[in-house]
Design a protein with these regions (language model features):
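Chalcogenol-based redox active-site neighborhoods
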Residues: 1-160
């Protein structure tokens, strides 16, 4: 069950990133403070749709998002920071940042999840994108369990 909605404050949760090769924590309050952020969730780094379509779409349109006043774009998944770092850095031209929801804090705080146990992945963050302005949720583009339409870079650009 989805626990967040437009005009809510984004939940203050802890993510992981690699800093000098070591996992470090970062809180959403640090990321979203006084910034316009697009947070894109994918079920898993290195998975086909995420790697071949979702992330490349945002890389391609990154400058267009900047022109619309977006400060940063973050991709998040229920992976560890080592996997997320390797995935994002496998795209040499990427200016996209990443967050690892290894402890599933975002999943639990938002309810935006998908059960991929049959595919060997377990319960993961679902595919979605959220536009956050200074910590306030302005729009949620939830794929509601599958597909890639609402949370695509092209759709977000049209709806900002």
């Amino acid at each position: 069950m989805v626990k967040i909605k437009v005009d809510d404050c984004f939940p203050d949760v802890t993510f992981f990133q690699l800093v000098d090769g070591n996992p470090k924590t970062i809180r959403t309050s640090d990321i979203f403070n006084e910034k316009k952020i697009i947070l894109v969730s994918v079920p898993g780094a290195f998975t086909p749709t995420c790697s071949n379509e979702h992330l490349p779409g945002y890389i391609k349109l990154f400058d267009e998002f900047k022109k619309k006043g977006i400060d940063d774009i973050y991709f998040v998944a229920s992976n560890d920071p080592f996997v997320m770092d390797a995935w994002i850095n496998s795209y040499s031209e990427s200016q996209i940042k990443y967050l690892a929801d290894s402890k599933l804090e975002l999943l639990n705080a938002t309810g935006l999840e998908i059960d991929l146990t049959v595919a060997g992945l377990g319960t993961r963050l679902s595919r979605f994108a959220i536009f956050v302005d200074n910590g306030l949720i302005k729009n949620i583009f939830d794929e509601e369990g599958g597909g890639l339409a609402k949370s695509s870079a092209e759709n977000l650009l049209k709806n900002l």
